[in-house]
UniProtKB/Swiss-Prot annotation:
Belongs to the iron/ascorbate-dependent oxidoreductase family. GO terms for biological process: biosynthetic process. It comes from Arabidopsis thaliana. One of its GO terms (molecular function) is metal ion binding. This is 1-aminocyclopropane-1-carboxylate oxidase homolog 2. Keywords: Iron, Metal-binding, Oxidoreductase. Signal peptide: none annotated. PANTHER family: 1-AMINOCYCLOPROPANE-1-CARBOXYLATE OXIDASE HOMOLOG 2, OXIDOREDUCTASE, 2OG-FE II OXYGENASE FAMILY PROTEIN. Residues 217-318 form the Fe2OG dioxygenase domain. Fe cation binds at residues 241, 243, 297. Its cofactor is Fe cation. InterPro entries: DIOX_N, IPNS-like_FE2OG_OXY, IPNS-like_sf, Oxoglu/Fe-dep_dioxygenase_dom. It comes from the Eukaryota.
Amino acid sequence: MESTKIAPSFDRASELKAFDETKTGVKGLVDSGISKIPRIFHHSSVELANPKPLPSDLLHLKTIPTIDLGGRDFQDAIKHKNAIEGIKEAAAKWGFFQVINHGVSLELLEKMKDGVRDFHEQPPEVRKDLYSRDFGRKFIYLSNFDLYTAAAANWRDTFYCYMAPDPPEPQDLPEICRDVMMEYSKQVMILGEFLFELLSEALGLNPNHLKDMECLKGLRMLCHYFPPCPEPDLTFGTSKHSDGSFLTVLLPDNIEGLQVCREGYWFDVPHVPGALIINIGDLLQLITNDKFISLKHRVLANRATRARVSVACFFHTHVKPNPRVYGPIKELVSEENPPKYRETTIRDYATYFNGKGLGGTSALLDFKV
């Protein structure tokens, strides 16, 4: 009688713990020479699917717009107006756009990416000393912040730090990327102020309106490392999610992988040399009462032969307890367009967002009126 093969049991909790305790992340798995990814990284076929081809009424949608910021110095009123109109349309329809001539030097962009790569490619014993899930630390290096709560892990490692309003002391940051993190975050804060002015004008408000609401007071920098994946069709670099920030400034690699979901279809975001990718976060959708939208996005697993890196800078208010509540801006609501969201503190929203983890439904749904 032919024997029946029994599939080996899968103890997910034990495998997650074993992976986490290596303290070397996905990079450690790749360095070990694996040819198949562990089951904890397997995502469902439903999540991995991408409906194609596009229906005829969406064929005109190529990808997210690219907007020229004129070196952040609009001497020409027409160019200024065009930038505002471009941002208004992109923020309302895509929630994403790329910016060129943004005032951050190409040299600094490359140095920042090199710093991320240099950190993650240090010897494992160096990285192990910094690996932690103590989210109270100034600097955190780990793999998958939601490792124990997500349905499946993502094929990436990350380090992050809050750079504003209370920047870390130099000794709090790894020497290998310290200087470039400090300089890049300063430049992103300057760019962020300019972007929030344009976004305010796009809403028909005073240029300082969003700044006065402290939308750009806090800045959190996440530096992702996506090693080559031996089975990229089974997992993600980052699973689908929207950002729980007001605004995100993303420094991408020239290895593509970012996709944005619009009307149920995933659109590739092409590499534009020297560009930064800007996207609307949940909190900006909330306070603009859906005038600007925060779309879900994801990163495909890396098919290249070298690692992909990216740097995401999230504009919040700040992480310290703050009684200030945020709801739809009063100038943007009326009897015909009543508030769609209830008021919340940033801390309450962040607690819910982080507890929910990536994937699934938008955290905004829980704050609907």
